[in-house]
Amino acid sequence: MDIKSNSFFYIFISVVLLLIAILQYDLWFSNTGFIKYQALKKSVISQQKEVKHKSQTNVQLYSEVVSLRQNSEVLESLARENMGLIKQGEVFYSVK
Protein backbone atom coordinates (compact mmCIF):
# COMPACT_ATOMS: atom_id res chain seq x y z
CA MET A 1 0.00 0.00 0.00
CA ASP A 2 2.95 2.27 0.52
CA ILE A 3 3.93 2.02 -3.15
CA LYS A 4 0.37 2.73 -4.24
CA SER A 5 0.05 5.86 -2.10
CA ASN A 6 3.54 6.94 -3.19
CA SER A 7 2.60 6.68 -6.88
CA PHE A 8 -0.67 8.53 -6.22
CA PHE A 9 1.32 11.32 -4.56
CA TYR A 10 3.68 11.58 -7.57
CA ILE A 11 0.75 11.62 -9.99
CA PHE A 12 -0.96 14.31 -7.94
CA ILE A 13 2.20 16.44 -7.83
CA SER A 14 2.69 15.94 -11.59
CA VAL A 15 -0.86 17.08 -12.33
CA VAL A 16 -0.48 20.13 -10.07
CA LEU A 17 2.82 21.08 -11.75
CA LEU A 18 1.25 20.61 -15.18
CA LEU A 19 -1.65 22.89 -14.22
CA ILE A 20 0.78 25.50 -12.89
CA ALA A 21 2.77 25.32 -16.14
CA ILE A 22 -0.39 25.76 -18.22
CA LEU A 23 -1.50 28.71 -16.12
CA GLN A 24 1.94 30.30 -16.34
CA TYR A 25 1.94 29.92 -20.12
CA ASP A 26 -1.49 31.51 -20.26
CA LEU A 27 -0.35 34.33 -17.98
CA TRP A 28 2.67 35.24 -20.09
CA PHE A 29 2.03 34.24 -23.71
CA SER A 30 -1.71 34.19 -24.46
CA ASN A 31 -3.65 37.00 -26.15
CA THR A 32 -4.61 38.29 -22.71
CA GLY A 33 -1.18 37.67 -21.22
CA PHE A 34 1.39 39.99 -19.73
CA ILE A 35 3.55 40.33 -22.86
CA LYS A 36 0.54 41.31 -24.99
CA TYR A 37 -0.52 43.72 -22.23
CA GLN A 38 2.87 45.45 -22.29
CA ALA A 39 2.77 45.80 -26.08
CA LEU A 40 -0.74 47.25 -25.96
CA LYS A 41 0.28 49.61 -23.17
CA LYS A 42 3.15 50.97 -25.29
CA SER A 43 0.79 51.36 -28.23
CA VAL A 44 -1.72 53.29 -26.12
CA ILE A 45 0.99 55.63 -24.81
CA SER A 46 2.22 56.27 -28.36
CA GLN A 47 -1.29 56.98 -29.60
CA GLN A 48 -1.97 59.31 -26.66
CA LYS A 49 1.15 61.32 -27.56
CA GLU A 50 0.00 61.48 -31.18
CA VAL A 51 -3.47 62.65 -30.12
CA LYS A 52 -1.95 65.33 -27.89
CA HIS A 53 0.26 66.57 -30.74
CA LYS A 54 -2.65 66.64 -33.18
CA SER A 55 -4.82 68.47 -30.65
CA GLN A 56 -2.16 71.15 -30.29
CA THR A 57 -1.95 71.44 -34.07
CA ASN A 58 -5.74 71.74 -34.27
CA VAL A 59 -5.72 74.56 -31.69
CA GLN A 60 -3.08 76.44 -33.70
CA LEU A 61 -4.97 75.96 -36.95
CA TYR A 62 -8.24 77.01 -35.33
CA SER A 63 -6.67 80.21 -34.00
CA GLU A 64 -5.32 80.92 -37.49
CA VAL A 65 -8.77 80.39 -39.02
CA VAL A 66 -10.33 82.71 -36.44
CA SER A 67 -7.75 85.42 -37.11
CA LEU A 68 -8.29 85.09 -40.87
CA ARG A 69 -12.06 85.41 -40.46
CA GLN A 70 -11.89 88.39 -38.11
CA ASN A 71 -9.06 90.43 -39.62
CA SER A 72 -8.98 91.08 -43.35
CA GLU A 73 -5.46 92.52 -43.07
CA VAL A 74 -4.15 89.14 -41.94
CA LEU A 75 -5.94 87.49 -44.86
CA GLU A 76 -4.49 90.03 -47.30
CA SER A 77 -0.99 89.58 -45.86
CA LEU A 78 -1.25 85.81 -46.20
CA ALA A 79 -2.49 86.11 -49.79
CA ARG A 80 0.36 88.48 -50.65
CA GLU A 81 3.02 86.21 -49.14
CA ASN A 82 1.80 82.85 -50.38
CA MET A 83 -0.04 83.63 -53.60
CA GLY A 84 1.70 86.75 -54.89
CA LEU A 85 -1.43 88.89 -54.68
CA ILE A 86 -1.02 92.52 -55.72
CA LYS A 87 -3.64 95.24 -55.81
CA GLN A 88 -4.62 97.05 -58.97
CA GLY A 89 -2.11 99.77 -59.68
CA GLU A 90 0.65 98.20 -57.57
CA VAL A 91 3.93 97.04 -59.04
CA PHE A 92 5.62 93.93 -57.70
CA TYR A 93 9.40 93.88 -57.48
CA SER A 94 11.21 90.63 -56.72
CA VAL A 95 14.67 91.12 -55.25
CA LYS A 96 16.87 88.07 -55.16
From Swiss-Prot:
The positions making up the signal sequence are: none
Q: Name one GO biological process term.
A: FtsZ-dependent cytokinesis
**GO cellular component annotations of the record:** cell division site; cell septum; plasma membrane
4Fe-4S in keyword set:
no
Primary localisation category: membrane
Q: Which UniProt keywords apply?
A: Cell cycle, Cell division, Cell inner membrane, Cell membrane, Membrane, Transmembrane, Transmembrane helix
The domain of life for this entry's organism is: Bacteria
Q: Where, in residue ranges, is this chain on the Periplasmic side? A: 30-96
- Bilayer-crossing residues are 12-29
**Which residue intervals are topologically Cytoplasmic?**
1-11
Instruction: Write down the membrane topology.
Output: Single-pass type II membrane protein
Q: Where in the cell is it found?
A: Cell inner membrane
Main function: Essential cell division protein. May link together the upstream cell division proteins, which are predominantly cytoplasmic, with the downstream cell division proteins, which are predominantly periplasmic.
Quaternary state and interactors:
Part of a complex composed of FtsB, FtsL and FtsQ.
Q: Which family does it belong to?
A: Belongs to the FtsB family.
| Protein name per Swiss-Prot or TrEMBL | Cell division protein FtsB
